[in-house]
């Protein structure tokens, strides 16, 4: 069965598997220039806290020892910049994203922050990474894996490119656990976020998709099983902010 015969979800719509990546690309082409501003508005700045927790969990070495990070779906560079500022002189991050517009925003940000010698940008597909086996000490993906058409392939690639002892970290939206907060969160997500998107980027539909894609993503226990199935060991997760997001971890051992 080829991709024209298979379907997957794009938000709440079913689409041919081969079309999802193009549709996702269109979303991020549309919002790239205002993506970071919208993250602040949508989360009330909480995304900064969640990303700091991710980097503290990664804990890149502060020594001169070489440490190679692959930040997939890293687009505008937020995760890599945070890691570079925390790490020692031996650190280098490679941001890999399928969307050239997002990468260009990241390159400009790297120049402004004088991090262009420590963070590089490569256009590529999470399902088929153009890196040799066992190339990286860590693999991060923040708010990106739910947009990948075939998540199992992305996880297999993450495992392949990690060195023995390498760590996989994934920050992704999850299922709200606090009674009452779930209803408020839905109200904000489906009614406010698309209108914020319209006001800031001129595009409500892209943000409607992003909200819908959160609801379609597996619950933390189900996603943890997918991580384990890809070969990772010591798989765990922690929920943050009442379950709005989850930080998943696994090791190649």
Curated annotation (Swiss-Prot):
Q: What pathway is this protein a component of?
A: Quinol/quinone metabolism; menaquinone biosynthesis; menaquinol from 1,4-dihydroxy-2-naphthoate: step 2/2; Cofactor biosynthesis; ubiquinone biosynthesis
Binding-site positions, S-adenosyl-L-methionine: 76, 97, 125-126
Specify the superkingdom. Answer: Bacteria
Q: Give the reactions, separated by semicolons, that this protein catalyses.
A: a 2-demethylmenaquinol + S-adenosyl-L-methionine = a menaquinol + S-adenosyl-L-homocysteine + H(+); a 2-methoxy-6-(all-trans-polyprenyl)benzene-1,4-diol + S-adenosyl-L-methionine = a 5-methoxy-2-methyl-3-(all-trans-polyprenyl)benzene-1,4-diol + S-adenosyl-L-homocysteine + H(+)
* This protein's record includes keyword Transferase: yes
Keyword field:
Menaquinone biosynthesis, Methyltransferase, S-adenosyl-L-methionine, Transferase, Ubiquinone biosynthesis
* Protein's recorded name: Ubiquinone/menaquinone biosynthesis C-methyltransferase UbiE
Ranked from the top, the taxonomy reads: Bacteria, Pseudomonadati, Pseudomonadota, Alphaproteobacteria, Hyphomicrobiales
């Amino acid at each position: 069965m080829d991709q024209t015969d298979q379907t997957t979800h794009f938000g709440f719509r079913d689409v041919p598997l081969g079309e999802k990546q193009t549709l996702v690309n269109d979303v991020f082409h549309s919002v790239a220039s205002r993506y970071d501003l919208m993250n602040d508005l949508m989360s009330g700045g909480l995304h900064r806290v969640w990303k700091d927790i991710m980097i503290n969990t990664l804990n890149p070495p502060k020594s001169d020892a070489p440490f190679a990070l692959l930040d997939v779906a890293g687009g505008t560079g937020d995760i890599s910049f945070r890691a570079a500022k925390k790490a020692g002189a031996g650190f280098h991050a490679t941001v890999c994203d399928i969307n050239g517009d997002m990468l260009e925003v990241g390159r400009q940000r790297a120049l402004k922050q004088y991090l262009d010698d420590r963070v590089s940008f490569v256009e590529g597909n999470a399902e088929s990474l153009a890196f040799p086996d066992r190339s990286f000490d860590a693999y991060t993906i923040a708010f990106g894996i739910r947009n990948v058409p075939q998540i199992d392939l992305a996880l297999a690639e993450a495992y392949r490119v990690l060195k023995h002892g390498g760590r996989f970290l994934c920050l992704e939206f999850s299922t709200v656990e606090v009674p009452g907060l779930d209803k408020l969160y839905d109200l904000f997500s489906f009614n406010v976020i698309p209108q914020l998107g319209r006001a800031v980027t001129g595009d409500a539909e892209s943000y409607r998709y992003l909200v819908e894609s959160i609801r379609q993503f597996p619950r933390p226990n189900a996603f943890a099983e997918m991580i384990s199935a890809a070969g990772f060991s010591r798989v765990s997760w922690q929920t943050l902010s009442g379950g709005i997001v989850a930080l998943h971890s696994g090791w190649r051992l």
